[in-house]
Amino acid sequence: MAGGSGERFWPLSRVATPKHLVPLLGARTMLEETVRRVEHALPAEQIFVLTNAAQIDACRAAVPHLPPAQFIAEPAKRDTAPACALGTALVRRLDPDAVVVFLPADALIKDAATFAGQLQKASALAAKDDVIVTFGIRPDHPSTRFGYLEAGAALPESTAGCPFFHAERFVEKPDAARAAGYLASGRFFWNAGIFLWRTGTFLREAQKHQPDLAAFIEAFPKGDASAYIAKEFPTLPKISVDYAIMEKAARVAVVEARFDWDDVGSWTALPAHLPLDAGGNTIQGTVTVHGSENNIVIARGRVIALCGVRDLIVVETEDAILVCHRDSAEHVKQLQPHLPDKVR
């Protein structure tokens, strides 16, 4: 799924080239890194990119080895449940018994081999039973940025290298006190937003809980579906797959991820993955610092010089500059309504 806006990464992230289409952490975009990672488990012809009309050309350019037909543009922004319904419908017409894997294009996972191995085991579980499978990340701190899921009893399919549990419940992003309690309990995982199901399993759950999504899947044409998608997709309810399906589904299993994971949610995520100088500054581009500490500085064209400052985020592009305190990184998206259209 590659249709997000990435507004917290402005000014590098824009409407047509958001976070997953920007080389934030290296030479490749996050979308290309995601596709390369999935190719450890699946052949390229089975990988589809769900995006939108504003981003589809840039997505195709980022992953040129995938055929253009494997990039699907959603005609309207309807959140993740309709996106999952669209992806399920596309795969269902190719193979009614197939297992579909949905994953975000903008998460960072470096251990591709472990990821691929667990993905294959999760796919086998989803194929065998009418169960939806999701990945959970064991938290190492009480984050309030993620949704959580509570794990119950271990499943018979569980192994030391790939633990499976019954998913008891999904919970929204908690406050600090609840997050601390979740961490202390040892029963809660961060929701990684990675889901697997057989097409028939998703359809049955949609029939019970989201009949509009079920009807969309059932009426999906076998031939050219572009006109159908353009007409029907914008009418679907705007709702996340967590609320629409995952919280209500009869059987959900959670896999404890044994690979590294970071959703790279804002500028403050970069220091964990990029080199730091002696002052703890994270620097990309031509940057000079003097008496400055703990800054994140990205220069994409001009020279940036910092003197006697700390805890700043400074990002320079050809047509815009961001300066903010590190503590305000989560609020960068709130600039969007106030920015000129030409730099959004």
Where do the model's predicted regions map?
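Conserved beta-strand scaffold positions in the cores of enzyme catalytic domains, especially
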Residues: 21, 71, 132-134, 251-254
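Conserved N-terminal catalytic core of the sugar/cofactor nucleotidyltransferase
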Residues: 8-11, 15-18, 23-120, 137, ...
